[in-house]
Amino acid sequence: MTATTITVQGTHIAWYDAERATVEISAAFDGAKRDEVFARATQTAADVTAEITPLHSPDAGPITWWSSDRVNVWSERPWNNDGKRLPLVYHATIGIRAKFNDFEALSRLVEKLAVMEGVNVGAITWDLTDERRKTVTDDVRRLAVEDAVQKATAYASAAGVGTPSVIAIADPGMLGDGSGGGIGPAPIMERMAFKAQAMDAGGGAPLALSPEQIQVSTSVDVRFSTP
């Protein structure tokens, strides 16, 4: 009896709790005098780093890593509603990033910085530790292959042929017959946005950050042969 070839794509999606959070902070000012704008930005950035440095410990946290950009200063001449050029306006901004392993400490810092003049708290990126990321990536890949085996076994049973044996495994699209597609060759780690519950107008409830889980997904093409 002629062997039957079965080619399927296995997929797996898993969700994991975030273990790290990186917050983006900036000190930004603008005005008519370059030196004044520069000085305000650098002083405010120094005030922010003064809040960060006592919290920094690579091993213990709550801040495991942080960095600060050089000050960026530029100018522009805006237009008014009548189409006339206005005097120069100078802008200065300094970016700061900090990675946390303690989300309550992150909430407290964000709450404190949010009321500082010239300070903007931007995106918060949620992630896993490097070690955890490698572990879950291996798990997701293994489960994607198991999904492919289950599919091929079901197809073989429905077709009335023998138990399928693996003859090729590849990232999507690499089996050479155009059978790929799908999610992609490498596990995709989707870092979901955070939810924040800010203080009410009376200042009663503290800021609470609630990270969504991180999605890790992958696909694999597997070719089987049946007797």
Question: What name fits each language-model region?
Answer:
Residues 1-227:
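Short, charge-dense linear interaction motifs
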